[in-house]
Regions:
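Membrane-helix and juxtamembrane interface regions of eukaryotic multi-pass membrane proteins
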Residues: 3-90, 94-111
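Hydrophobic transmembrane alpha-helices
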Residues: 4-24, 62-66, 73, 116, ...
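Juxtamembrane interfacial secondary-structure elements that flank transmembrane helices
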Residues: 24-37, 89-93, 102, 127-133, ...
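Membrane-interfacial, low-structure loops and terminal tails that flank and connect transmembrane helices
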Residues: 37-40, 136-142
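Short helix-to-loop capping/linker segments positioned immediately adjacent to catalytic or ligand/cofactor-binding
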Residues: 96-103, 122, 138-142
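Active-site pocket-lining segments that scaffold enzyme catalytic pockets across diverse folds
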Residues: 108-127
């Protein structure tokens, strides 16, 4: 444990500043995975394998740091840990194997994802197990019944549901062997072109409200900085590909707003 409270605060500020740079940059450079993959991103590997290698590190780091911290099974922190791990269990070990088709991911994108996930694992574990404000979680089970905690839990699971349902909708747009793009129109896709990203944003916002952890809010900001510009790029691509009429009044990521 080479960090102290002060170093951890600096770490959070640096991560927040880098997220701002990423947010601005992604409006100019489209991250080359999915529909935006081009040869210029260099060597690529199988998409399923890439997702596992990219998302598994945060699951492993979080588990390791939880074990090392001695936080044990004390509620509410253990409950936060389980929610976080539930998301990444799905994202690293289930989601990749549900992906259809033979698409590939540039190794450069995967490497950036791995670096972020390692840092985020340290950030979230630090915020929950090592540097949580004194006495914040002292109420045990009673903490989970506080209004903000209940709101956070509801948002977390609502966001997770939207995220999973939206991924399901996207997977079932194509018949086997088909490689064309289609405009998704079910569920929250009636309101936004990137409903899966909206779900993820709501999920982590719920987590941050629930845990009241500054580190979790930095992660919300990172999620926003990463997904909002991409949702904008997808929205533009859909308008080019399917026309303004087909896209209609749908927003990019936040229903009715953006």
């Amino acid at each position: 444990r080479t960090m102290n409270q002060e170093t951890f605060q600096i770490f959070l500020w640096v991560m927040s500043a880098v997220a701002l740079v990423v947010f601005i940059a992604l409006y100019f450079v489209k991250a080359g995975y999915g529909m935006f993959r081009t040869a210029s991103w260099g060597i690529s590997i199988n998409n399923k394998l890439a997702w596992v290698l990219m998302e598994a590190p945060v699951f492993i780091v979080m588990f390791g740091l939880w074990g090392k911290s001695g936080a044990g099974f004390a509620v509410p922190v253990y409950f936060f840990f389980l929610l976080f791990q539930l998301h990444y269990l799905q994202r690293a070990f289930i989601f990749p194997f549900l992906l259809k088709g033979k698409s590939r991911m540039p190794v450069a994108i995967m490497a950036m994802g791995i670096v972020f996930n390692l840092l985020n694992g340290m950030m979230q574990a630090g915020g929950l197990f090592y540097f949580a404000p004194e006495g914040l979680y002292a109420d045990g089970w009673a903490y989970l019944l506080k209004p903000h905690a209940l709101l956070g839990i509801i948002l977390f699971f609502a966001g997770m549901f939207v995220n999973l349902h939206s991924d399901y909708v996207i997977r079932h747009l194509r018949r086997p062997g088909d490689t064309k793009h289609y405009l998704p129109g079910k569920g929250l896709y009636r309101y936004v072109t990137s409903a899966n990203y909206f779900g993820e944003l709501v999920e982590w916002t719920g987590f941050a409200i629930l845990t009241a952890s500054p580190a979790a809010w930095v992660f919300v900001w990172w999620t926003f900085a990463n997904l909002v510009p991409r949702a904008d790029a997808i929205h533009r691509r859909y308008r080019e590909e399917f026309g303004d009429e087909a896209v209609g009044k749908r927003k990019r990521i936040i229903p009715f707003l953006y």
